[in-house]
Amino acid sequence: MEDRRIGVYVCNCGTNIAKVVDCDAVSDFAKKLPGVAVARSYKYMCSNPGQEMIIQDIRELSLDRVVVAACSPRMHEPTFRKALQTAGINPYFLEMANIREQCSWVHDDARAATDKALALAHAAVRRVVHHEPLEKRFVDMCPATLVLGGGIAGLTAALELSDAGQPVFLVEKDDHLGGNLARVDLTAPYLDSARDMLADRIRRVLESPKIEVLLRSTLQSLSGFVGNFRAEIRVGADGARTVDVGSVLVATGFREFDARRIEHYGYGRLPNVVTSFELERMLREGRILTRGGRVPKYFAMIHCVGSRNPEYHGYCSRVCCMTALKYGHEIKSALPGAYVYDLYIDMHAFGKGCEDFYRRTAEMKTMFLMYAKGTTPEIVPSGPDDDCEMLIKVHEVLSGEEIEVPADLVVLMVGMEAREDAADVAHLVSISQDKDGWFIESHPKLDPVATTTEGVFIAGTCQAPKGIPGSVAQAEAAAARILGKISRGKIEVDAVFAEVDETRCSGCRMCNELCPYAAIEYDAATKRSRVISAVCKACGCCVAACPSGAIQGRHFTDRQIFSQIEGVLEWASSQG
Amino acid sequence: MAIRANPRLVEELEHYGAEDVAKCYHCGNCSAVCPFSREPFLFPRKSMRYLQMGLEEKLLGNLEPWLCYYCGECSEECPREAEPGETMMSMRRWLTSRYDFTGISKLFYRSWKAELAAILLVALLTGAGFLLFGFRWGGGHLGVYAGEGAFLTTGAVHVFDWILGCVLAAFLGINCARMWWFSIGKDRTLRIPPLAYLRQAFLLPVHFFTQKRYAECGKKRPWAIHLALMLSYTTMLVLIMFFLHAMHSERTVWAAHGFGYLATIGLLGTSIYALRGRIRKEETHYKHSHETDWIFLILLVFVAGTGILQNVLYRVFHLDVAANVVYVVHMMGVVPMLGLEVPFSKWAHLAYRPLAMYFSELQAEAIRERERAVAAAGAPLPA
Amino acid sequence: MGVPKKIGVYFCQKEAALPMPVDWDAVAEYARGLPGVAHVEVRSPRPAPDPEVLAHEIKKRDLKVVVVAGDSPGHFKPAFTRAVALAGGEPTEVRLASFRQHGAGADDGTERAKAVVACAVHGVPFGLAASPRPTAVNPATLVIGGGVAGIQAALEIADAGQKVYLVEKTGTIGGHMAMFDKTFPTLDCAACILTPKMVAVGQHEKIDLMTYAEVQDVAGEPGAYRVKVLKKARFVDPDACVACHACMEVCPVAVPSEFDGGITTRKAIYMPFPQAVPNAYLVDAAACTYILSGGKKCGACLRKCAKELIHFDDRDEVVEIEVGSIVVATGYDVFDARRIERYGYGVHPNVLTALEFERLTNASGPTGGAIVMKTLRRNKRTKQDEWVFDAEGPRPGSVAIVHCVGSRDKKYNPYCSRVCCMYSLKFAHLVKEKLPDAVCYEFYIDMRAFGKGYEEFFERIRLEEVFVVRGRSAKVVEKDGRMTIKGEDILKDRLVEFPVDMVLLSVGLEPACASDRLAGILGIDRDEDGWFRETDYNIDPTGTERGGIHVAGVCQGPKDIPDAVAQASAVAARVLKSVVSGRGQGSRASLTVEEIESRARALAGA
Amino acid sequence: MGFEPRIVGFLCNWCSYTGADLAGTARIHYAPNVRVIRVMCSARVDPTFVVKALAEGADGVLICGCHPGDCHYSEGNYKAMRRFPLLGRLLRDYGIEEDRVRLEWVSASEGKRFAEIVDDMTERVRRLGPSRVKTLLEADRVER
Amino acid sequence: MPEKKLQIALYWGAACGGCDVAVLDTNEFVIGVGFLVDIRLWPIAADGKYRDVEAMADGELDCTLFHGAIRNSENEHLAKLLRRKSKVLVALGSCAHLGGIPGLANQVTKQEILERVYLDNPSIEAGNRVVPLPSTRVDAGELEIPRFYRRVYRLDDVVPVDYYVPGCPPAPEQVKAALQALVNGTLPPARSVIGASNRTVCDDCRRRKEEKKVTRFHRPWEILQDPDRCLMEQGILCAGSATRSGCGVRCPDSGMPCRGCYGPAPNVIDQGAKFVSAVSSIVDSKDPREIERILGDIPDILGYAYRFGLPASLLQRSIR
């Protein structure tokens, strides 16, 4: 260690640093530190001459470590790393001391600032001694993708990938493609044909030579890591397939809320209380009748069935309002003399064209009745003189009145909920679920399709309730991620990651659950944990937690940080 | 007890001009911008709501439409163009038809052809009647307009006026009584002490003659126009009912005629202004016109025009024959206008609106009293 | 094919349908000539089709298949479905031929409509028969707009190893998101999640970042566009500038800061914000004394810059680039609250728009995140009194937040801006967090808390004792010397008048002002509200009729950050797909009716 | 000269270090007593680092991470949050004053907050006086 | 058979004598040892005087097994003396290695100890307030007793140590192995830990390990434990993961958690801090109050974390 040849470069940043920090004092001080071969102070280290100076010194003085005391590493670390690389030494042999943003710009006492700069420079010198050469590595990327779920999201992603020439295995539990959308006839707000858009996609998928569709199939197990997954799939009753894939897209969709759970709506008990999907079928078949075979006159849509109610699901299912409005239009088209009521809480008509659709539904004299969140309308039998099957009683909040409306057909706008097998899927592909059972994305804002498991993506309603455009966009976004990885052929693994020293790991599994990216694998046979470096994001959580010191985080090793601690303090104690 | 909603009412109200009420999504903007809306009468949103839901009973007892003077601010600010102002107007028409026990009003509002036919019929009957009277029974001459031997004697006309007036007052009185019943009488929860009726009675003439509430609107011109029209009309009514002799005298009685001319000019001017407004549709409250509005305005212009024409013909040009003919024609306008418009159509509001001001004050007082009682009893106020 | 089916084609229109450049009679005539068509009927808007009458007709004519054609034929489909069912037919044999959905809004509307009808008659989805011919594709991509959507799309494409030109109008990337304090519903800090992405863009070797630049002209065809980009003079070399602030400190000019929503000022030589990418200064030529005086006055910065990087002789330059795909991510402008006079914006000093409040409450804002009222202060330079934010200023004791300002309103923007409910709730939260004693009112119409975790956030706000008033407030007035907000509390059946110290207007989103021009340059459509039109609302929310040009983010329609990001990534998929496979997507406009019809015929036979 | 505390700061790269940089770009002045060591995430801060710093003579240790829910690594800061109470108790048992070690959340936009925290901490540590750890350890040292 | 028997000494500093018992627990082996070595000093088993040791030539002893910590001047003196006389000095057991249980006294001051033992102790007769002093004047002259130090040291703190055999007490087999290596001359390079593994107790623990998420900590007697499952996962604070193995997993095998007597794993500098880090990492909550509650179940964290090694920790002692 003592024979290190360290170069220390103190940037004046014009006067930005030099105005407050005595840069020459810093370089003079550094010169005397053990291992320091050269120390210089210069006007602009980041400028070309500045970088040239470093490069030249590395070559001529055979420096093997470099410290730059300048601005924040967040600004110029890449610049100087490049300079080291140009000079022919490992770019990670660099350490920066931030004496601008965190020193000269925030202090006006020149002495104190210079002291601080000295301490920081000292720490950097101490640290850089322990820097190790790190290389970016690459792992293979298998171009095939496993898509779970043959609904609109799965179909879209499969098509995007296969159109780009990449193989896809599309696994669908059912015996046909289309998922929940196959049950829908028209879509809100433009009343376009869902059937056409599905027919188009299904046909393309089936005709694509790159897509292998596995119907009546389920994923049995998934092993490996990004770029190198192996999936076992059960096909049909007793077939089995093992496929190697580089990425997995989970697009398993949703299931509808079971309206039976809200007993007082009487679904399953009252003949003319139906779910939205049942009305959808009536409309699609052109047979809109009560159970008794009568053409209904009064339709009541009850919104938020199972949604926005803490007893069932606290969240909004996002599409039901627009679907109910759509039914309003459809009913008036199929039965021009019918009356439609919408019993709603808040009208969620937020998409493109949706507010307009809402307005037009209102213009068609759909009667909107607002009930309060936390309450529910009540369905009661009609009297002998009524010309309807049932009456709905509701505390209507916009008028403040208790009112009743006649109804022949009550339509329960059932919300979406996570599928019953979501937990199994989550476990198989090691992703997490939120409290409602939806799969959790890597970052709600900036990474809505990735998961914390590298190489596993989610799209569509398995992530959260959403409409068709949202599902399609997400599916394509996931395809973009996958294509991005495939198109580079290899997966670049950052040089900085955590690694387990297997000779020291005792398999205590303390770390296993800590990694948000599931980068830590436990091998039951050897009783050792292992960090999949391709998946690791180098946060260092496991490093800090490992009670046996078996995990080390590259470029942020205990050794390096200890030296830094000693560096900032030792100097200070000797000076002050 | 739950009230039954009726999806058909909103369809029915279309006949009365409420075409856009279904568009309302209840943002509450209108009630808040309305210069007249104040507790406990929050309108127009709430009335719109009752209408959307078809709560007929609620609407029938609702005086709020009468508290609205259609200044148009609500409609201007409505984000959905649901035309709350026009909806209130339509509700006034509907209420008029409901107060009217004969059902004639309903017929007129639902069919402008029926109204027009009725007007023509009454006009023809009136014309025929006056001609018969003039030529046969009155003993006058077509060549004499005023004084001795006049074609239509003042006395006879005066008697006719009073008979007509009494008939109209009877109709209107019954309708007003119905209005009271719907809005106050039927509601058992409202306790109004008899004295309160007396105490607040001053509101009737005040609102009748000043429409002072209209003046609370941000824009003053509509109020001024309306006031001019109302005062002109009232002046004319007083002149005709009480000073017909003076009006009819051979010489010009400026004390009467001065007012007469002023009132006629007022009537003509304001109604022409209103007609022009309804054609141009620049002002919000003129944007939507029901057929009955046109009929009424045309009648008004016609009556005022013929009224002044006969005067001018007689007094300026001394053309007695022409004046008499115009007089008959004038009466053919006046009688249907008064006979049909006052009890059964638009003109009824001259009675309903001051009454509504009066009743609503009584209601408000009773509501406040009830709330005070509830508060005193310690029960929580409705949130 | 066997015996041709008896097909009936019904042209139906709604009264309110938009005027479309379609000659219906010509299309009807064309439909008559299609195989199997037994009956063609152009229906007038009124009366609406009566299923029972239709059933009778269908039975009489023995139609086996019904094609409903028109702008939005879905509106009539249930009637026809029921009619066919009543007539004993197969309800699945009712097909739609939607002109609007399939882009018959362009100049060749009639031709497109014919093709749409032909596909429906053949029973082939239009998208299948009319998929554009693939083109060769230049692997480079142009991304227009450096907001979060543009950044995401650029990174996504560049990370896959493809060249990207990112053109941004202002001096830095970051867009609106960089201005935000927290993002709903997780309340994570916008800068924390955005700046790493911005830095990544700035440092990406595959991204050619052109800030302070505008697209001037686009020529060529899908897969091979030639784009002229106007690079406005920055007057400071962004690569060499070390962001030392020395120049800014001496600049005597102060103009409203765009980044701070106008609530603070910046200099004529400025960096939009401290984390700007590129992290360098630029000169606002419209404000700089030196430039305006032709070099006769000032020049203080010139003398101050130790690196001598300020070059006032810089000129705008036009560069031409060649790209295969273009991603449009130009974002939005916010609604100008001055347009609604009754809210008193611009009259009452403490009526703020959402963006202003974002900056006020931002830790990097003028008050360090303290929520204060504006106070009157004399400007030493102009000798005038000004309303300014001062970190030590008085804290508002009551704040009202008004939803839907400019949105859901036929007079302004009829559409829902989609994000305001949530950001308003966020504001309420921030107010309660920073000023626990402050009274906070929210005036809303519908609480559109529809996304993941949104409803829970709304519940949380309620627990924080924010007064949530259902009823959009009507106006802000001065009453007894205090600002007062008036509205109807619908659920409580009261007219309310709250004296408030501060009013926040939740202004909606509007298409960016230049989007009209850009649509012209790019040859893409805008919808009636001004947003760029996508190929298909549902299944192609990012494509445009012009092949190789994609839309992402809010410029296609209001959306929140997750949706904008997802869409931006989706666009990247489209671009990467074409680059990886070498097959770009051509314009659909290049297909003729005959071609589509023959393809549909072939597909139907297959 | 009075006592100038020596404080070691462990700042997470994504929020707090960026926030500290922002304080710089915004020229927000604060006490020069904190010497920053950058870590990728507050979860990397091993309690050992804290005791090491104290043993080496630090008068205070400041740990800063992203606000809860904001972590660049989803939930690293929660791990820091979990470790802190137990570490605090450990230090208390050692007799080290509570104010010497602090865990704070600083976002990338909170340059001002960072400055305030540093000032406040410096002031509190200044009031506590120099840490006795190192002096005592040195005094205890036995000649071998 | 070597020509000359090995000369060894066994000595105890501040210790309980358990390590001696551990030596004896090697059973018949220790008798065999007797044939191979001369035990020159072993206070617990044989008579011997300090002056005999002082009389030895430097390096005369081949090896000294020193157990016990350094608490007073006598301990230090003998440690230094034996160091001088021995070729090889072995720190036997936790006390010599890390400070051991006596090291827990570093939580309090010398003053507090004296007060507690001699003044505040309930077993002390009322009025008896005698505190020993290093030197007392009696009729016979100046009476000296060893000086009581401010704190406890490890052996290593006062003399350079060649080998460390951890454990409280060291497992007899490990003692046996160490003695055997000594006799056979197969000792590893100096300054290393012998008689222990390079991994932690978990490596040898037979209990099933799964994923760790703890919402409540229990004392061992508070719950009915699953005998096959990791104690930590059951909420029993077990230091096994942070402790060198070699003990034979005696505690967890008998249903008690590991207390950490073998000291930190080779790469770990501060056993207690690492343990705190690991334990708190697996607390399953994101709510500060909840976290406090869960961790609140752990009593006396300093005692737990450094039960056998407080003087070996980075901070070594309480600064009160």
Question: Model segments located where?
Answer:
Chain B
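Membrane-interfacial loop-to-transmembrane-helix junctions in polytopic alpha-helical membrane proteins
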Residues: 14-20, 61, 153-156, 214-224, ...
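Secondary-structure capping and boundary motifs in well-ordered enzyme cores
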Residues: 23-26, 60-63, 67-70, 261-264, ...
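Cytosolic juxtamembrane regulatory segments of multi-pass membrane proteins
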Residues: 194-209, 302, 361-383
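Ferredoxin-type iron-sulfur electron-transfer modules and their immediate structural context
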Residues: 1-65, 350, 358, 364-365, ...
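Hydrophobic cores of alpha-helical transmembrane segments in multi-pass integral membrane proteins
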Residues: 91, 117-132, 158-177, 225-245, ...
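Hydrophobic alpha-helical transmembrane segments of multi-pass small-molecule transporters/permeases
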Residues: 29, 33, 73, 77, ...
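Iron-sulfur-cluster electron-transfer modules
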Residues: 21, 38, 48-245, 249
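Flexible metal-binding regulatory segments at protein termini and peripheral loops
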Residues: 1-2, 92, 96, 383
